[in-house]
Amino acid sequence: MSPSKKILVLLLFPILLVSSHPIPAEDPAKQCNLSEDDLTKLKAAISSASSAKAANEDILPSTTLAACPMLKNFTEMLKTVATDMEVLKTQGVSNMEVQLLRESFEEKLNDLAKNKDIFERQANQDTSKAEGEMVEKINKLQLEMAKLQEEIEEQTKQMYVDMIEYIFERLKMNDTEAIDSYAQIVMKTKMHELIMKLKTDRLVLWEMVKYVEGKKNKWVGRKVLNTILDQVNKLKLYKPEEVEIGKNSLVVVWCWKFNSETVYGTTDEDQKSFHLAKLFFPKEKGCKECADVKSRTMCNNDYPKVMVKAFG
């Protein structure tokens, strides 16, 4: 090879290397950088969440979110926290319990907003180092927020469990005056869980439907009726203990329906009842004494007997 060709190959070699092994593109996350205004908005949003106020619009501009994609779900996370804080603020087993719980989370959120490691910059830092640290700060912020969100959700869930237990115990003592505020909340939000608890004790379930009837709210009445029937429909007929729960629950429903103003004329629910009567009382069709259903009846009417006699 002539000297001139050797020189040409040597000149082309670096170009070929670059073409076959291109320089990797810079990680987009490393380009993430937040302005002082962005940091201020984040702090304000966290403070709002601590007061149970969710931001109605995106916290950060689209350009910032494009550069920092890990922050895209931050608005939704804060909205969830704000909603959970609102639940803690307005509902609960006792005002003192909820107040202490809310104050605890409010303090944690405010501490997060004041976190210097996240929200304060170091002076005279070069750009690349500042961007790298910003990614670390955002990751830390997301992690802290996620932990707090999970903790709030767990506490809120436990609060509902306590409320359901409270309603169950008050109904057992026939103390319905004490459960008004709790029942209103639980019936709107946790009806299924409440009835799951009640249906294991037919006496308490009977007290519950009498309580509901006394409120004369047709929407709530129908909701309770459907929840009971739907749960009975899910019971396993090959399990004797579940058959017992189903039979007792149906007799309670039939006792309730006889003179009810709240669930009168619920045709769809009647069809469900007819079907369930066939499943749970197959031996009672055409019965004279109807001993099985009679032994479960806590009311002074014969409607449960009529039901199994006709549809069992």
Swiss-Prot record:
Induction: Blood feeding does not affect expression levels. Female salivary gland (at protein level). Low-level expression in ovary. Possible serine protease. It comes from Aedes aegypti (Yellowfever mosquito). Belongs to the salivary protein SG34 family. Residues 95-158 form a coiled coil. Residues 1-20 form the signal peptide. This is Salivary protein SG34. Disruption phenotype: (Microbial infection) RNAi-mediated knockdown results in reduced replication of duck Tembusu virus in salivary gland after an infectious blood meal. Reduced release of duck Tembusu virus in saliva. Up-regulation of antimicrobial peptides in response to duck Tembusu virus infection. Keywords: Coiled coil, Signal. The keyword Signal applies.
